[in-house]
Amino acid sequence: MALGKNKRISKGGKRGKRGKAQETMARKEWYDVVAPANFEKRQFAKTICNKTQGTRIAADVLRGRVFEANLADLNQSAGEEEAYRKVRFTVQEVQGRNLLTQFHSMEVTTDKMASLLRKWCTTMETTVEVKTADGYTMRLFVVAFTKPQANQQSRNCYAKQRLVKWLRMRITKMIKRRLSKVQIKEAVSLLTRNVLSDALVRRCNPILPLRELRIRKVRVVRTPKFDAQALLSAHGTIPASVEADQREVEEAVEAAPAAEKAAE
């Protein structure tokens, strides 16, 4: 009977030749996420990434990451009144241990939208797509709710269809006129500080009395070619991270004993 190799039996290897297990966190670095200059709190988050090793560059891995923050945390002077809005940023450039971000989207929380719904009124929604002066295409979702007129006897406050169409047309024209003349930095300030929504309420109230008008969602659907100078001008002076300096000192102190042992 011929004997052959039995594939079911694993070949025994040399024992004791396993490499020393390296700690996972030793291969990683911490980075600070920096918001543009039109927000009060600049460094609002931290993230972790593997160190540059061979052809795998850390900066390439970090670009494109999206981070979410609460608007009340970014603009602390506004207080808890702005806690119902979430702002997202996308990383565009890596500068040392700082990640320079740009506006990605903004959205109203689900519980806030649920609290605005009422019976006996008309809910109007419209979508507006506008291109800023520096080439960013933004899509805005606006929602409005009617309210009873003064001295009204009827229980409901439903709006006629022709007035709803007129309201949508005015909202669309005003948003395009205001945002098409400014850059992305000024457009974000108009949206986050309620300047645009307040102007829409003043212009739409003569047509229909509105109980609420909210820009419930904003998305950047198309971006221009990356411009490093424009990104740096949007960020202005980038605050230094004291913790990052401490981390570099700790890494240098840990590397010194290892170098002394190698010399011996």
Curated annotation (Swiss-Prot):
Molecular function, one GO term: structural constituent of ribosome
UniProt keywords, alphabetically: Cytoplasm, Nucleus, Ribonucleoprotein, Ribosomal protein
Subcellular localization, as worded in the UniProt entry: Cytoplasm; Nucleus
One Gene Ontology cellular component annotation held by this UniProt entry: cytosol
Coiled coil ranges: none
Biased composition (Basic residues): 1-19
Domain of life: Eukaryota
GO biological process terms held by the UniProt record: translation
Pfam assignment, any one: Ribosomal_S3Ae
Ranges for region Disordered: 1-23
Keyword Repeat among record annotations: no
Subunit structure, as described in the record: Component of the small ribosomal subunit. Mature ribosomes consist of a small (40S) and a large (60S) subunit. The 40S subunit contains about 33 different proteins and 1 molecule of RNA (18S). The 60S subunit contains about 49 different proteins and 3 molecules of RNA (25S, 5.8S and 5S).
HAMAP family reported for this sequence: Ribosomal_eS1_euk
Family of the protein in this entry: Belongs to the eukaryotic ribosomal protein eS1 family.
The protein, known as: Small ribosomal subunit protein eS1
